[in-house]
Amino acid sequence: PAKEARRLAAADFKSAQVKQLNNQPWQTIKNTLTHNGHQYTSTQVPAAEMKIGAQDIFPKAYQGKGVCSWDTQNIHHATNLWMSTISVHEDGEDKTLFSGIRHGVLSPYHVEDPLLRQTGAESRAKEVLTAALFSKPELLTRALKGEAVSLKLVSVCLLTASNVLGQEGTMVKEQMRAWQSLTQPGKMIHLKIRNDDGELQTVKIKPEVAAFNVGVNELALKFGFGLKASDSYNIEALQQLLGNDLRPEARPGGWVGEWLARYPDNDESVNTLARQIKDIWQNKLHHKDGGEPYKLAQRLAMLANEIDVVPAWNCKSGKDRTGMMDSETKREAISFHQTHTLSSPGSLPDRSGQQIFQKVLLNSGNLEIQKQNTSGAGNKVIKNLSPEVLNLSYHKRIGDENTWQSVKGISTLIIS
């Protein structure tokens, strides 16, 4: 009885914590950073502030609040859902360099009933699609006028698809199942969106999702857990994105091929990213750290953005691996804007690249998002393991001990 009483007390305490974190104000985080005379703005917009009128766009309104990463039984809302953008101030206006949607895993994994868990995962997936539509204002306007619109999403899940030391393998399966159920060929789905009059309006979308899973932690990159399961999803998603011929030298097909046929003059960065991704795939470079743990994940998001497809990425909580992916992508977007050259897979940032990375890590809003979710800022990706060989390459990539410590923060004290 004493043991049971302790368990119930702990559950009550956790529930009160979740309520407090959810009910605090969830507001847009906007930070600027400068490099080589250019001013960049990193913006993180929470679901509660995705608005057309006075209220947020979601049918079950957030009302200025949020859903923290510890809310693992929520079957109505996606966890920790944000729109993330990096822009540059040039010629008197802000120009978006990269924009996407970030969130926690779709599975409400502490719901015990498997049917309810799957229903919850689909509800969360619909919220991600709603946020993705919101991130494309022209598409949203057409949808609100009654047009059935096509919405393409590249989903990059960052879990380790194995149930060794956790249940991430099951979570990946449930996330993939949610995407599959909403994207049957030719399927039209109806989303309810709160319009500028504050009324719920049904919009029709034809969603297409290229759903990847790319393990990025030590279990995946140092021990090889979940790689085979992940790649069974990735082959299908790659063919959707790049066509059936995945040889690096082959002309891209799929969504990329369609985009190149429409915009043949803007092909350089798209072709480079497509080739890099196929090269990573052919040589299984995403199975190892190799100086760049997020080499595949980050390029998939960049390529999606370049071809006007919405990139979405997530881990379990939407704050640590998701935050590092956010920072790596913004680092590359700024670096590309500065040098007009995309970095090659597995390359460490040069001195200027490290300075960009340091500024992004501290000013991208990720420390604030971690604090919003757990009351403590710090990224669990940053750690010192023994023996040294088990560590991912973040000391080398960041290149500054003070920044490394600031990004690590108090993450070791936070449970999940």
From Swiss-Prot:
One Gene Ontology cellular component: extracellular region
Positions of the catalytic residues: 315
Highest taxon of source: Bacteria
Keyword Phosphoprotein found: no
Record-linked Gene3D superfamilies: Cell division control protein 42 homolog
Swiss-Prot/TrEMBL domain comment: Contains the consensus sequence Cys-X(5)-Arg characteristic of Mg-independent phosphatases.
Reported function: Converts phosphatidylinositol 3,4,5-trisphosphate (PtdIns 3,4,5-P3) to PtdIns 3-P and prevents the transition of PtdIns 3-P to PtdIns 3,5-P2. It is one of the known effectors injected by Salmonella into the host cell and is required for invasion and for an efficient generation and maintenance of Salmonella-containing vacuole (SVC). Alteration of the phosphoinositide composition of the plasma membrane causes membrane ruffling and actin cytoskeleton rearrangements.
The name this protein goes by in its record: Inositol phosphate phosphatase SopB
Organism: Salmonella houtenae
